[in-house]
């Protein structure tokens, strides 16, 4: 058993435009090399494009809906039992759900062709909002893996 105390979670203040903690975490994930102002410009620009294309009045609500659609419920974790490694399906913790969804959205937005991250991010958010695209496919693949390995669910720890 560990003798150390659990690490304290940092409290992140909300972003300056919408006051949302979730959006500020998303901005932090988009940020590269400590350039937060550029990350903010990219995210706010993408949100404006996203809201304009879908005809939403509040881009934050649409963003939260898109993020909710991308969150995985189950995932598989490797568990070694007697020389064999099993992929054990486990439920994803709420913080990890949103973290994984953000990572997947950003990863697929960066992999889109073209130079402008703002446009790629807006397109990926639109796809998530409409429950389609690469991020949703990744979520479905994760769920499919968990479903396929349901037989090993009794190895949970």
From Swiss-Prot:
SUPFAM superfamilies: Ribosomal protein S7
UniProt-listed InterPro entries: Ribosomal_uS7, Ribosomal_uS7_bac/org-type, Ribosomal_uS7_CS, Ribosomal_uS7_dom, Ribosomal_uS7_dom_sf
Keywords, ordered alphabetically: Ribonucleoprotein, Ribosomal protein, RNA-binding, rRNA-binding, tRNA-binding
GO function terms (MF aspect): rRNA binding; structural constituent of ribosome; tRNA binding
Domain of life: Bacteria
PROSITE patterns: RIBOSOMAL_S7
GO biological process terms held by the UniProt record: translation
Function: One of the primary rRNA binding proteins, it binds directly to 16S rRNA where it nucleates assembly of the head domain of the 30S subunit. Is located at the subunit interface close to the decoding center, probably blocks exit of the E-site tRNA.
Family: Belongs to the universal ribosomal protein uS7 family.
UniProt-listed NCBIfam families: rpsG_bact (TIGR01029)
Name recorded for this polypeptide: Small ribosomal subunit protein uS7
The organism of origin for this protein: Chlamydia muridarum (strain MoPn / Nigg)
Taxonomic placement: Bacteria, Pseudomonadati, Chlamydiota, Chlamydiia, Chlamydiales
Name of the gene: rpsG
